[in-house]
Amino acid sequence: MSGQGKRLMVMAGGTGGHVFPGLAVAHYLMAQGWQVRWLGTADRMEADLVPKHGIEIDFIRISGLRGKGIKALIAAPLRIFNAWRQARAIMKAYKPDVVLGMGGYVSGPGGLAAWSLGIPVVLHEQNGIAGLTNKWLAKIATKVMQAFPGAFPNAEVVGNPVRTDVLALPLPQQRLAGREGPVRVLVVGGSQGARILNQTMPQVAAKLGDSVTIWHQSGKGSQQSVEQAYAEAGQPQHKVTEFIDDMAAAYAWADVVVCRSGALTVSEIAAAGLPALFVPFQHKDRQQYWNALPLEKAGAAKIIEQPQLSVDAVANTLAGWSRETLLTMAERARAASIPDATERVANEVSRAARA
């Protein structure tokens, strides 16, 4: 699939859940000879992250409309129009053959600008319930893809592009068979941590005693307080780190994960082939619940929603999973994953550019 001379503009911003899958597709297509530029906003994570990956980035001024008050809503049409004009000028100069919208506020004006210039718009929805921007853009898109079934009624399910180091992990049977000793529990609340897990897991550790060993990612600024909580619970032996740079190594170490269920986390856990206890973030549209549901239905995970979360609920769940059960769940997780998601998205981008 040679893309010699073809030009792609990726539109993604705000959070890692939008940006990292976009980077995976960008690198895949760059290896095929494509030129790639990025459309983002100057005050979000993409501004620093994308240039580190050798990709030039253009900025437009746009932010979210949710919960901003009446003045912001009145000003919204003008802000969107100005952002559309900025995006249109950028695209007229760059002349992409196709644009790929991965979500975030930047995709809205960017997608409209591409459509107004006759440039094919390809969309990828990472979450189990569609975001507002992608709902709007789906009406004008050349192709709509989704990571999990249910975000769009008729869109192709292609999974989420995940990092190659996670995809390269040995399969569960090779990795987990023959493991003995305490069950290795990886606790991850996302890069920001999750206060509810930071508060709950030290007490869970006290209940489970030496049947588990825990590696707990606390999130920025929380390492000391979480270490103290484990010590006060009589469990100082467990490892607490603020951030985990090498998630593939953490997944390779773990027997089971206790975590939030952001789209990328769920897809990585499936690709790694790991059982999980998901505690979805309480978003009003239950986005993280819908992300986790396919793995629970596959018998690879359990969901405990935050109102039902307790020390006993977590401790009893983990205590009830034997090593044999964990291996079966791990194999089901891997079977439910879509390891070639990056290639699938890239192929649709190529197809749209040729159309």
Curated annotation (Swiss-Prot):
This protein's superkingdom? Bacteria
CDD domains, per this entry? GT28_MurG
- The record's top EC class is transferase
Name the Pfam families on file.
Glyco_tran_28_C, Glyco_transf_28
Q: What is its main location?
A: membrane
Give its localization.
Cell inner membrane
Could you list this entry's UniProt keywords, alphabetically sorted: Cell cycle, Cell division, Cell inner membrane, Cell membrane, Cell shape, Cell wall biogenesis/degradation, Glycosyltransferase, Membrane, Peptidoglycan synthesis, Transferase
* EC number(s) from the headed UniProt entry: 2.4.1.227
Q: Name one GO cellular component term.
A: plasma membrane
Q: Which InterPro entries is this protein grouped with? A: GlcNAc_MurG, Glyco_trans_28_C, GlycoTrans_28_N
What Gene3D superfamilies does the annotation carry? Glycogen Phosphorylase B
Q: In which pathway does it act?
A: Cell wall biogenesis; peptidoglycan biosynthesis
- Protein's recorded name: UDP-N-acetylglucosamine--N-acetylmuramyl-(pentapeptide) pyrophosphoryl-undecaprenol N-acetylglucosamine transferase
User: What organism, scientifically named, is this protein from?
Assistant: Shigella flexneri serotype 5b (strain 8401)
Quick one: which gene encodes this? murG
